[in-house]
Amino acid sequence: MWGSYTKVSLIESQEPIALSRPVVPPKPNTSALRRVLRRARDGFALNIDEAVVAMTARGEDLADLCASAARVRDVGLETAGRRGADGRLPITYSRKVFIPVTHLCRDSCHYCTFVTAPDMLRTQGAGMYLEPNEILNLARRGSELGCKEALFTLGDRPEDRWAQARDWLAERGYDSTLSYLRAMAIRVLEETGLLPHLNPGVMSWSELSRLKPVAPSMGMMLETTSRRLFETKGLAHYGSLDKDPTVRLRVLTDAGRLSIPFTTGLLVGIGETLAERADTLHEIRKSNKEFGHVQEVIVQNFRAKEHTAMAAVPDARIEDYLATVAVARLVLGPAMRIQAPPNLVSREECLALVTAGVDDWGGVSPLTPDHVNPERPWPALHELAAVTAEAGYTLVQRLTAQPKYVQAGAAWIDPRVRGHVVALADPVTGLARDVNPVGMPWQEPDDVESAGRMDINTAIDTEGRNTEARSDLDSAFGDWESIRAHVHELADCAPERIDTDVLAALRSAERDPAGCTDDEYLALATADGPALEAVTALADSLRRDVVGDDVTFVVNRNINFTNICYTGCRFCAFAQRKGDTDAYSLSREEVAERAWEAHVQGATEVCMQGGIDPELPVTGYVDLVRAVKTRVPSMHVHAFSPMEIANGVAKSGFSIREWLISLREAGLDTIPGTAAEILDDEVRWVLTKGKLPTSMWIEIVTTAHEVGLRSSSTMMYGHVDGPRHWVAHLQVLRDIQDRTGGFTEFVPLPFVHQNSPLYLAGAARPGPTHRDNRAVHALARIMLHGRISHIQTSWVKLGVERTQAMLNGGANDLGGTLMEETISRMAGSEYGSAKTVAELIAIAEGIGRTARQRTTTYALRGA
């Protein structure tokens, strides 16, 4: 022990449970251990079986294992260019204030003393949550002591379990613990300058995205991937919903998709087997390999605590702990920061941890105790520096986000906290400067000014792209090997076409187009040859019955107001990094001027969409709508995909409904149902790194319909998808339309592959075949019969002849004149970016049909 704090217990006594020793290492197989130790000496990463064997090392074998791990650690520090002021390699720490926002939780982990109940809090004279002034007082005192980090720790969703928590939040105007956490993080930034590191437990994609603008980093211990500990009565995680390994792995993945610098780790000695422990490490490695977001891995030893169900369980043995730390280093590699809490071991054990490959001590506070382990005081910083020096390293202070993320800028750190980070970061190393934090406004970036390649809307047709790909192609999209593995998994599920099934499905569809089974729709989607001709003929007949022979179009202008985006959609060739030669942004004045130009040319609609630029102010979307409506009051504003709406919601802290209403009140008329791609997450997470999940797309679109904002619907196909995904996607759209009736049309969007990163990486097909195009348009007409009357085809992506084929196979609408189009053109489409009214009329007349101009919502013009 390094010292002691007076412990005040806030927890209720729990009945002890009989647990065996957490880990009983199997008797090592000598030859297997020798082989693994040799591979470790040679610098090889260990697979799961090898990791299990390595964790049995003891005595001289353990020393050998630790020496190999230490060499790997040192190579990583050398490669990163890290040195202390004295020239020695550094071991880092974060000087922090521990802020226990609430000790309430909906879970009941058997080893936890942090969590308590409302009655116990009252007995201690404590509130359900720390009040704002309590949080700020802690943060201010920490700032005075040179702390840079405010560690917000709390139980999972206490309001779900405790009425007292719900009441406390409601009395103060908050609808959830996470809303309160967000507000307090902002106040700490503004009033003290400390950098929040948020540990609120399990969160959804949307919750993570709402918190990213208020914190440079977040964390959640994976703890273990053992389902046995979660599902078996009496074991450590039984009865704790949020300790489901599947759920926790999903959080880890979502953090990666959102490019959040993320801390995770494992607990050693809570009843897991060595195989389960090794699997936990490999799952962390797998997630980090795909996204590169795991900034540090905590390897934490179990310490039994009084008044818990696991009070009688022995602490993790030091040899077992050291072996696990060394294996973590060998599994996770030289670039990973491996962290061990120095307060959970003795001084001598700290020295041993350094020899095992540790290079980070985590957060250490000169002010507050470790509220999760209150019986284990932090070492004084001078003591920690001394033991680090004795081990041959220099103790160096870092920020809550590790240096490589600090230095990467907007790709990882939201602009709203970027200024706070820069104020505390050494500009050369990304480590902490020797300054005390000072509060500064948490504010929106300045209004967007026109910048970059503003003429790309016209130059794309004459000059093309300046570059083949964005500048961060190698890092923006995650690990391509992992992505290709996901694609192979999807390909293994492709259906087999059987002609007799197609004919039977066709007969069923002729009787009741909207009433077929999924298997029958799948058969129609795989039709080819004469069967495909019959399917498209049925679709064309349905089109004629529903909307007649008129081919409709709208006179509109696309205005893509920026192509700067860090979302990481792997199919997208439009997105650019700020500073790339093809990157641009348009000011609201420029957007309004383009809307006026469109109005003069007869346009009734502008369609506005853009990249997810982290520097776009939260008011940016509303400002764009108002700018257009002010310049051209009669213009129909069709704008902002569900992804853009999700971005606005995350930045503003509003609910989806509140945000959509604010856009509607500013003048927004309808929204495009883009960003759908394929509404199946197993496909979406291959197509895109960070775009919103299917469930949130559905929530945003249905909410838009409910507040009076109708939308189009779309599906992008021909990449890593297959017919079963088309059927499932259309079923989702049918379900939404049954609930809301808010879709105006369905637009199949063929994947344009030429410049797509996903295609260039060898992970996607070269777009759909002509058979695919015909089958998708026909299937849409059949499946959406009686629900969505209008099926649009894209002349931009298909060209004139294939567009005409779609009009003869179920489609009835040509979309718009567009006037400018950069998304498909930057992807490699060769069919131009604008059509005149005369050219659209000619497309229809070329197949003996009449073209009619319409409004956005399909009222005929001049009728």
From Swiss-Prot:
Cofactor binding comment, as recorded: Binds 2 [4Fe-4S] clusters. The clusters are coordinated with 3 cysteines and an exchangeable S-adenosyl-L-methionine.
CDD domains documented for this protein: Radical_SAM (cd01335)
Gene behind the chain: fbiC
Pfam families membership: CofH_C, Radical_SAM
Highest taxon in the source lineage: Bacteria
Spans annotated as CofG-like: 92-424
UniProt: [4Fe-4S] cluster 1 binding residues: 105, 109, 112
One example GO MF annotation: 4 iron, 4 sulfur cluster binding
Pathway(s) per entry: Cofactor biosynthesis; coenzyme F0 biosynthesis
Span of domain Radical SAM core: 91-343, 551-792
Similarity comment text for this entry: In the N-terminal section; belongs to the radical SAM superfamily. CofG family. In the C-terminal section; belongs to the radical SAM superfamily. CofH family.
Taxon lineage: Bacteria, Bacillati, Actinomycetota, Actinomycetes, Mycobacteriales
Protein name: FO synthase
Catalyzed chemical reaction(s): 5-amino-6-(D-ribitylamino)uracil + L-tyrosine + S-adenosyl-L-methionine = 5-amino-5-(4-hydroxybenzyl)-6-(D-ribitylimino)-5,6-dihydrouracil + 2-iminoacetate + 5'-deoxyadenosine + L-methionine + H(+); 5-amino-5-(4-hydroxybenzyl)-6-(D-ribitylimino)-5,6-dihydrouracil + S-adenosyl-L-methionine = 7,8-didemethyl-8-hydroxy-5-deazariboflavin + 5'-deoxyadenosine + L-methionine + NH4(+) + H(+)
UniProt-listed Enzyme Commission number(s): 4.3.1.32, 2.5.1.147
